[in-house]
Structures are given as structure tokens and as C-alpha cells.
Amino acid sequence: MTEKEGTFRFKQFRVRQSRCAMKVGTDGVLLGALAIVENQESRVASQESNRPIVKCLDLGTGTGLIALMIAQRNPEALITAIDIDAGAAGQAAENFALSPWADRLTAVCGDVRESGDDGKFDLIVCNPPFYEHSPAASSVARDTARRTDTLTHEQLVECASRLLVNDGRLEVIIPYATTDEFVHLGWLRGLHLVRRIDIRTKAAKPYKRSVLSLVKIEELKNGRIEHTHSFLTLLNPDSTPTDEYRELTRDFYLDK
């Protein structure tokens, strides 16, 4: 159940959003559901065992939705959620306190570009600003939340490379048209693509979003890195959710 200026209800938690410029949306739900939050086989030459996902950072958290979804999916995760907007950080803190995982969620108001937590996080998730140099949004807060003038993709990958542990992972959802450029920016910073999922609303529509998984690797174990590439369609021709989308979100949406 959703109210634009009120509360969005999920199966295990609620998201209040009246003080956030950017409301709960499909992009955030997709990243929260698709992000790899479980332990994965190490790709680092000096590391033999799997790296556990424990310390996580939700960059530009907004309402805290993605952090809450990660907390639900991974019972071991300790999640820090940062936002440059005080209203959003305060709203996220409120949502965390009302959730079943309040002891594992921390909201911080700050600029990630000034963070001193170098090499701290196993996982960084981000639903970043999605347009550059576009006409101003309807409010200063919304403009700050949406414009890549505030945090560019280049700055995002630089921050992720600095803040991740070796073998740590960056999970993002970005516009499909910017995917190749983003992957290249990541590669320049030692973040290597391991998974790509292209997403469209309907089969007759063009792809609009991509969810990318990039791993920080300072020394490769077996040389070249291969990545998987898959596709997701959200709606059937009659606008009902596809079986794949229903399955993906069944643990979250009340009506799935």
C-alpha cells in the first residue's frame, strides 16, 4: 500500500517518505532485490575462501529502502546508510528504528566523498542520480537527490574503489544508455564487471535500466574476469507483473 506523501508498506517493514525528495520507486526495489548480498567465491589471488558480506554501505540512501531490503535478505549484514540531505538521513533513521533490524542499521548525514572509511566495506549499493545537466527539478532537495552534478558516476566509482575492501562489491542500478561508460569507469578504478542485468518494462519496449555488479580486484586470481549478462522484463502485455518479476519481489511486496 502506498501513499505519495505518507507510508509505503512492505511485508516486513514500512517506509515513511514524507521528508524525502525521492520517494520509493521501482529502481530502488529492483536494486534491493537483485543486489548480490550473499557470500561469493573470491576472485582475488591472495584469498582462497569466500568473502563474507558483513559491512555494507547504502550510498545516497534516501528513505533507507535499499538498506532495509538488504537487512531483510542478509541476517549478518551491518549496514551504514549515508545521505547528503539531512531530511533524507533523518527519515531513513526513523524507518530503521521502526524496522525489525534496527540494531544492524545506521543512518548518517554526510558527503561520501569526504568519508574516511577507506577499505572498510564488503558491499556498496547505490541507486545514483540519473540525469546530467537537465532542467531543474521541482525542488532544491529533489534536484540534489537526482542530479549527477552532485555525485557524478566518475566520483561514485572513485569512492567505491576507495571504500571497498579488496574483493568487495559495488552494486548499482543506472540508465541502460550509460552502462558501457560506467563499466569503463569502473575498470579504470579496479572495479571489474561480474554481472549485468538489463531491464525493460515490457517486451515491446527498449531497455531502460541496468543492474551492475562490479568487484574490486587488486590482483586477479586467474587473469581475465568473465561476467554474466541476463535480461529482465517487468510487465506482461496486459501490464500485469511477469512471473519473473513476481518471484523477484514476492518477499517484499504485499500483493505479490
Give names to the regions the model predicted.
Residues 3-39, 53, 59-69, 227, ...:
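SAM-dependent Rossmann-like transferase core, predominantly class I methyltransferases
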Residues 16, 80, 106-108, 194-197:
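General small-molecule cofactor/ligand-binding pocket signal
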Residues 20, 24, 150-207:
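Conserved Class I SAM-dependent methyltransferase catalytic core
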Residues 31, 127, 156, 214:
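Residue-level signal for inorganic ion chemistry
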Residues 33-39, 52-119, 123-126, 132-137:
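Conserved SAM/SAH cofactor-binding pocket of Class I
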Residues 37-55, 217, 222:
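Short, basic, low-complexity termini and linkers enriched in Ser/Thr/Gly/Pro
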Residues 128-155, 159-162:
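Mobile active-site "lid"/loop adjacent to the S-adenosyl-L-methionine
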Residues 206-256:
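SAM/dcSAM-binding transferase cores
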